[in-house]
Amino acid sequence: MKEETISVIIKPLVKSGVYKNEEVALKDIVVNHIESKISNYEKTIKKIENKYNMSFEELTDELKNEAHFEQEEDWMDIKGAIVMKEAWEKARESLIKENNYV
């Protein structure tokens, strides 16, 4: 995305007084998006852990013995959510570290 396109999208937020400047607006929007992604993956993880009343690690051990189709699908969903949550957490950490953003 070109810098001018980003500016066109962000400028109304600055003009309306919601943000001090475009840089602050963009950083806040990106951090909020990352936080939303992390929260959604945490909900997915918690939902599946609650469904089986066990942690991902316990579910993994349980499925080694015998798994049914639905359990395998749930395991793949929770595994994917864990991987993506960790990726978004790394992205957030990198953004904060590289931009001195708190």
Segments (PLM) and residue ranges:
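Small, basic N-terminal interaction modules of short regulatory proteins
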Residues: 1-60, 86, 90-102
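Broad hydrophobic/π-residue packing in well-ordered secondary structure
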Residues: 48, 59, 72-78
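Amphipathic alpha-helical coiled-coil segments and their boundaries
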Residues: 20-23, 27, 34, 64-67, ...
